[in-house]
């Protein structure tokens, strides 16, 4: 994640009441101080928080949530140094979602981000709370995220970077660099397609020349029938199938029906595709074989080498 994430859709509503009930049995500390609780109850709450966070973050291998939960009772002038440890994140959950209590975070001395929503931010950032004068109105706990290894990160737009991974988990698009074994019916050597989780293919480039017109096919076999053969009217001669029932990009248990296909529209999105093409030029040592069979007599076999780059792009 970035250094700050604001949760403004009630993601933690399911455990807010549990925190309020836990507070009722907590022995209060001196006035204007926080109380840290660790018990079997907080372990259960931490487990719930972990499950919620897993749904929020992509490409995360492991999430650790401390079972130490702090009920905060600072006023606006208190310092907020809770620990000397600046590795990981703080998660702040408001006990009630009134807009009076605010979290102020300072990414730079000249910049302040103010939020009255549940929020998670890096421990390395300076922060304070505002309008926390009476009672315990929010809780804090420590979070540690471990990400799955990525090949690299590339810029998607002015404010966002995307991880490029060789793992299907938590991703929804696959950029496939496809090299074709020589065959007298095939006119191409390399094409690149973007495959969504329904199996639809967007033709991106061939020989590293990018298409500006968006050609979308329901499957890689459909793309091949339309694009790679020298013969005219190929559809009248044979059809293609994969005898293993495999998709070119995804394991069958990862496929989902009814997905909308991502289509580049803006200059930033086309620049992103160009960067993806450049990454593929220099990271193409690992590949899988994919085979399509034409129903001729005897069968015609087409063999492809496929290098896969997985990304997660929110576009629905």
UniProtKB/Swiss-Prot annotation:
Similarity comment: family membership: Belongs to the poxviridae OPG031 protein family.
Inducing factors: Expressed in the early phase of the viral replicative cycle.
GO terms for cellular component: host cell cytoplasm; host cell nucleus
InterPro entries linked to this entry: Poxvirus_C4/C10
The name this protein goes by in its record: Protein C4
Subcellular location: Host cytoplasm; Host nucleus
GO biological process, one term: symbiont-mediated suppression of host NF-kappaB cascade
Keyword Chaperone in record: no
Record function comment: Plays a role in the inhibition of host NF-kappa-B activation. Mechanistically, blocks the subunit p65/RELA translocation into the host nucleus.
Keywords, alphabetical: Early protein, Host cytoplasm, Host nucleus
Organism (species): Vaccinia virus (strain Western Reserve) (VACV)
ATP-binding in keyword set: no
Coiled coil region boundaries: none
């Amino acid at each position: 994640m970035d250094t700050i994430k604001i949760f403004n859709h009630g993601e933690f509503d399911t455990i807010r009441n549990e925190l309020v009930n836990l507070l009722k049995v907590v022995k209060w500390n001196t006035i204007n101080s926080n109380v840290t609780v660790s018990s079997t109850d907080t372990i259960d709450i931490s487990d719930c928080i972990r499950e919620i966070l897993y749904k929020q973050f992509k490409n995360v291998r492991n999430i650790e949530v401390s079972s130490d939960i702090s009920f905060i009772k600072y006023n606006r002038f208190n310092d907020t140094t809770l620990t000397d440890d600046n590795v990981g994140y703080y998660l702040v959950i408001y006990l009630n979602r009134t807009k009076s209590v605010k979290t102020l975070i300072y990414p730079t001395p000249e910049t302040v981000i103010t939020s009255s929503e549940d929020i998670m931010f890096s421990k390395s950032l300076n922060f304070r709370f505002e309008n926390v004068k009476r009672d315990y109105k929010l809780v804090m706990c420590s979070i540690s995220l471990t990400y799955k290894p990525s090949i690299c990160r590339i810029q998607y737009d002015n404010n966002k970077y995307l991880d490029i991974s060789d793992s299907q988990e938590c991703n929804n698009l696959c950029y496939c660099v496809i090299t074709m074994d020589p065959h007298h019916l095939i006119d191409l050597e390399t094409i690149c397609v973007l495959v969504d989780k329904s199996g639809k293919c967007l033709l991106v480039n061939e020989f590293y020349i990018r298409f500006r017109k968006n050609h979308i096919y329901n499957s890689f076999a459909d793309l091949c029938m339309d694009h790679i053969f020298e013969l005219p009217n190929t559809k009248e001669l044979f059809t293609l199938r994969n005898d293993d029932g495999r998709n070119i990009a995804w394991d069958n248990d990862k496929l989902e029906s009814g997905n909308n296909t991502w289509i580049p529209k803006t200059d930033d999105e086309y620049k992103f595709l160009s960067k993806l093409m450049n990454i593929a030029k220099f990271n193409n040592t690992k590949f899988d074989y994919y085979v399509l069979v034409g129903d001729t007599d005897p069968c015609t076999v087409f063999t492809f080498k496929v290098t896969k780059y997985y990304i997660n792009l929110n576009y629905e």
